[in-house]
Amino acid sequence: MNLSNQPLVSVVIPCYNHEKFVQDCIQSVIDQTYQNIELIIIDDGSKDGSVEKIQEMIPACQERFIRFEFRYRPNKGLSETLNEALEWCEGLYLSPIASDDQMLKQKIQI
């Protein structure tokens, strides 16, 4: 399918101390059947190994997504993290997902 026929969907993952789950979350976005996706990940000052787990996924994200952003910043809380991520989104649609959740493969396609 021609990506120009698909609206861009912005997927936002705010992360805080989810090193055990964040890679599965990111992989579930990579595995989406819908293709025209940008992924924005913001780590909100995690004190565990979340940042390292996210960094391990960067090459796969850069290959898969139309646009990919990963930012780390001091903890400011979920609301401010989501508001900041919204400023970076370029998609027509937004699909936030918690870093300890996973998407079904056709979630965005539907």
Where in this protein do the model-derived segments appear?
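Nucleotide-sugar donor-binding/catalytic module of glycosyltransferases
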Residues: M1-I110
